[in-house]
């Protein structure tokens, strides 16, 4: 019945280009702040509709469907009988020319890194599809799949890589020993600010 196009404020050129096509439609433009996690679906649904998804729920629970641009692109292609054989992949971090590429599924990380001019460090790890929700790999022969969103190249001695290699029990022990119960993590938690009972300091 109605569409909402969420886009971060920093993407000025994209906003101008898209606005031309949404003015005479039932699609509203929702300008989001330039911060994480404004792309989170709970945040998106609230920003675009002022509806709150129930805890542990999904957007459909409040009559919404959330998808990204690439998904809509692939749905369109499927509607005309074109299968998904290529993927948009962002390459950033310790590479000479950080870029986004449209590559065939099955392209190796080694090839993509070469497309980006190569690395600026010889000893590195690869975060696949994000630092928070992705995984860590050291295998450049690994390939792009339908779920690969991007790769981030970081030196092997980077804090995030050493942290990812820790066991959960060690991470919990360090967290408990360092926490002074200031509750800032809770007070600034995006879900808590929306009214959800998420209190990570406890």
Predicted regions, residues:
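Catalytic cores of alpha/beta
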Residues: 114-115, 138
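Short acidic beta-strand-loop surface patches of small beta-rich interaction domains
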Residues: 8, 124-143
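Ferredoxin-type iron-sulfur electron-transfer modules in oxidoreductases and energy-metabolism complexes
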Residues: 154-176, 184-202
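Eukaryotic mixed-charge, acidic/polar low-complexity intrinsically disordered regions
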Residues: 136-156
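Short, well-ordered secondary-structure micro-motifs
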Residues: 16, 41-42, 137-140, 163-164, ...
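Immediate flanking context of iron-sulfur cluster ligation sites
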Residues: 118-127, 167-181
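Hydrophobic alpha-helical positions that pack around
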Residues: 2-109, 115-122, 130
